[in-house]
């Protein structure tokens, strides 16, 4: 009986040793795991605080009145900014303070890229002030005069006139389709004894339009259709004050051609 008990104890010794080895291996694995995590955290902290985490590329879209550099400065995001310190909504708030900006979307692209998508208020015209052009936006606000005289967006140019009439015209210009708005080169306020709201338009197609502020947008709806009725090369005045008709210019006998369009229906 004694011998059998001894044998049983001896059988258990290898099992105990195996268990101890397994425990030791588990401890080693955990230690390696903890050290690895700690090492990665240290690397991340070093990367976070070093210039390696700075923005490497900033792409700006939709800006006409601000340079890319100005957008970066206003947003607070530059190439000296750490990617992890960029807060998209804060950059958007900074940019929407600009009166020409309607909406902004800032996107972060890991590991070091930023995209800035800008939606500007529609430019409905340029006010000519002593030969310098001042952009007029659909929200009724004006921007600083353009430094180089170049038009960043196609829109009509007009001379300043009575503020009340300007407001009425702005409200009408906002209703125009982009195609018609881009067709207008210049708007002149030219009141007559019969019509204090009279306007003279000079179109990019080379034609002159006589119209009025009242229901201006509705009257101009027919302009693209009228163009199709004009023979190429003809100098024509398009009268949209009452109904719509064209008057040929430069001929010995000026010819009037009635066009069947009811502009106010």
From Swiss-Prot:
Bilayer-crossing regions: 31-51
Positions in the Cytoplasmic compartment: 1-30
Topology with respect to the bilayer: Single-pass type II membrane protein
Sorted UniProt keywords: Cell cycle, Cell division, Cell membrane, Membrane, Transmembrane, Transmembrane helix
PROSITE patterns registered for this protein in UniProt: POTRA (PS51779)
Record-level GO cellular component terms: cell division site; plasma membrane
Domain annotation POTRA: ranges: 53-121
InterPro entries recorded: Cell_div_FtsQ/DivIB_C, DivIB, FtsQ_DivIB, POTRA, POTRA_FtsQ_type
Keyword Metal-binding: no
Name of one Pfam family that matches: FtsQ_DivIB_C
Keyword Membrane: yes
Extracellular side: 52-265
Gene3D superfamilies: 3.40.50.10960, membrane protein fhac
Listed GO biological process terms: FtsZ-dependent cytokinesis
Subcellular location as annotated: Cell membrane
Protein function: Cell division protein that may be involved in stabilizing or promoting the assembly of the division complex.
Family that this chain belongs to: Belongs to the FtsQ/DivIB family. DivIB subfamily.
Protein name as annotated: Cell division protein DivIB
Species annotation: Bacillus anthracis
Name of the coding gene: divIB
